[in-house]
Structures are given as structure tokens and as C-alpha cells.
Amino acid sequence: MGGAYLLRIEDTDRARSTPEAIDAIHDGLLWLGLHGDAQTTYQYARAAHHRDVAEAMIERGTAFRSYETSEELDLDRQRVADISERLRKVRNRLAHARPDEPVDLDVDLAGTNLDADFGDISFDQMVNRGVTLLLIERRLRELNPAFRSRYREGGPPPSPNAPFTVRLRAPDEGDIVNDDLIQGQVRIPARDIDDLVLLRADGNPTYMLSVVVDDHDMGVTHVIRGDDHLTNAARQIPIFHAMGWTPPKFAHVPLIHGEDGKKLSKRHGAQAVHEWRDMGYLPEAMNSYLMRLGWSPGHDDILSKEEAIPQFDLAQIGKAPARLDFKKLASVNAHFMALADDARVAALLVAEIEKSQSLDTAQRETLVRAAPLLKKRAKTLIELADQARFLLAKRPLQLDETAKSLMKDDFKQRLKRLHDHLAAEPVWEHAALASALKAFATQEGVGLGQIGPGLRAVLSGGAPAPDLGQALEMLGREEALARIADQV
């Protein structure tokens, strides 16, 4: 799409916009490699300008000072809550009704162009006569219109120093139209929009005002956000119009759902960016996986950020919510783990293990040597660390019960001969070591399967370990031979 990537911290909610919360945003974006093209804008720092815009709207007649008391506003909040509760009850009744069962809607449908008001009717009758939930909702809102301040026409304040808010003079007629680039055209009757508060009684701008002013001043052309903000577009468009500004294009992306099809929440696992990092995912894997949620570029390839940017098209984003698939995410992460630079993976591996134990220089060197071999077997950094822990075990290794059962006298004799055979190996590299093991098995007149389990137990103590040739190379000649000698 081109354009510039601007970072704005919307911190008008001062209670929630703590330094820790803001630092977490910066930290997460930096980890993902999302660096803004300009200096970060902090919304609250522009509050004085936002207040100036509110005053300009008053001068234009598109905003006004409102002196409603808290008691009056509480009554209106209760009215809105009552509407929501009635709608909830209607939805619940319709969801659980059998086709031939009478349904008491408890809603006055007078004036809806239907034949009559309805009391107890069956679900089939209701559908056949055109009664839908949308119609019921529309009727409830007709009976309970959006909030309109009694001061919108300029009534005098109740006292000379009465506190006031500044409100938008919401349009009364027509529809507010949002030609959404993903959801299609969304029309909301203007009468459903409240006289929104723009400045609170303490003089602080609200989010609704601040975001519109900042979008205009920053030259924002496209607002791409979650579809939980779809109704906010209908509230923000009139504010743009109130200042004579052209609204940006809106694109409301469906929210991500969990594997169970429900809206993503804490019960589905990690949510904050740092939690995904702590679970062992790479930033490039998160970028690639999240980019593809809901976006269908026409193929199933795993894309890097650099590959995806020129292909991205809002028209290819579906309206249905995408589901988070942890197995797919792990597969994508494994792909990027295998491609990652060896030195980087080694540093990440050392850092992951040092979360739970201290390492000396020799142990770090062992992990650095092992990382290129292990990285192709692990799906996350946590898996990588788990697979590497056998390398750090202190000698002599404490064998688990299964490993102990393999240490028969005849096997120990064979193990001694294997020790001498490997000690003579000139090249300590996994392919050469794998060949040496096969040659030894042939020399002993047995299959490799009669040597492998016991050798793996000797090298790891019974902990999971990779291919034997790789395990020997990772441990290094001295450590590997010493572990074998300990069990002879």
C-alpha cells in the first residue's frame, strides 16, 4: 500500500497509560521489528491542541457546552442499560425457541409497518410476518433514541460557574455512511449517535476527539483496526465532518478467535506480545503467522515480512474471524528456526537456559556448538533448550531406571570397545561419527539397534537426545568419551 508507518501512543486514559504499559508497547513492537518511520506521537501531549479544536467546533456551531448533572447522566446510562438488557432477553428467547413454540417478545412493535403489535406468537409466525431481531432492535431504539443534550440549542447554564462538558452536536437526519474496505458499506442512522463528549468536565479531551484530530494532523489516509471498533467509525466520521475534514478510509479487520471459535481471551493462552516471546517464538515467525490470519494472498507459502509487504491487499482479507492455530504457529516457527542464523540461535539458546541456571564458559561453548544441529529439530526456543539440557549434565551422569536396565555386563564390555573405536576416529563430526558407529556395529556382528539405545542412555542419562552422531559432535570428543568411560 505504500505510505509511512507512524506510531502513536493513545494515552488519553491516564489511569491505564502507565510508564510500564507504554514501555511494554515499545518493547513488543521493537521485538517484532516494527520500527516507526518518524518520532512517536503521544496523544496526551497534544491535549492543548485538542482543546483548541473543540473550541473551534463550538465556534462553527458543531459542538456545544453541556451542563447536565451527574444525576441526569446516570438516568440516561440506565436507559441505555435497559435497552441492552431487553435486547439480550429477546436474543435469548429467539435462540432457545422451537419453531412452533409461542415466544413472548415483550417488545412493542407499533409503527413497524407490520399488521399489528405482537404478544405471544410462534417463531414460524414471527419469521413469516417479517419480525427479525434487527427489526426489534430498530424498534427499541426508536422508542429509546440516542442521547440528545437539552443544551444543544444553546440553553443557559444553571449557574454562572456551573461545570460543563463539550459535546458534539450529532446529526439528526440521514445515515452515517462508512464505505469500509473490508466490511463493505455500513450505514447507521444518525439518530442512533449520541451527542458525544469531546471535552470532559476537567478539560481533558476524550479519546474520540483526540484520535480524530491526530488522524487529521498526521495525514492518516487509512485506519486499519479490529472490527470491535466498527461502531466507533460511525462516531468519529461526524467529528471529521464537524471540522470540515475528509475522513480517512476505514478497514475493520475481524478479530482473532481461539481454536474453539470464541473471541480470543486469556483462557486461550498468551495475549501480550512479551508472552509469545516468553513461549519461545521468534519475531519473524509471529509476523508471518499473524499476517496470514484472515489474509488470503492466493497461496499457502510461509511469507517473510519482506515478501508479504509488496503482496498485501486489503481486498484479500475476509470478513470471517480467523482462528488461532497453535500447531500451525509452531510449524511456522520451526520453519524460521531452521532458517535463522546459527550465531543468533546460539545466543537465544544460551539466554533461554540462563533463565533457569548459570552457565560457565565451557557450557556456553558447548551450546554454541550444538545450536546449528539442534535448531532444525525444535519448534520453539523452549523445545530447543529442553533438547540441549543433556549437554549440561554433570559427570558422572545419574542414569534413569530405563537407562540403568540397559547397562548389562556384556553391553559394558561392548561399550569399552566402542570407546576405543571412537577414540581413534580422526574427524569428530556427526556424519563421520555416524559412519564410525555403523562400522563398529558391523565389526561386532550386530545391528545398530543393539547399540544405539544404550549409547544414547550413556550420553544423556536417559534424557531425550538427538541423532547419535549429532549428540557425539555436540558433546565434543573429550566429554563424549568421558561419559562413555564413566559407565564402563
Each language-model region and where it sits:
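Histidine-anchored nucleotide/phosphate-binding helix
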Residues: 1-3
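Short glycine-centered, acidic/aromatic-flanked micro-motifs in structured strand/loop junctions
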Residues: 9-11, 225
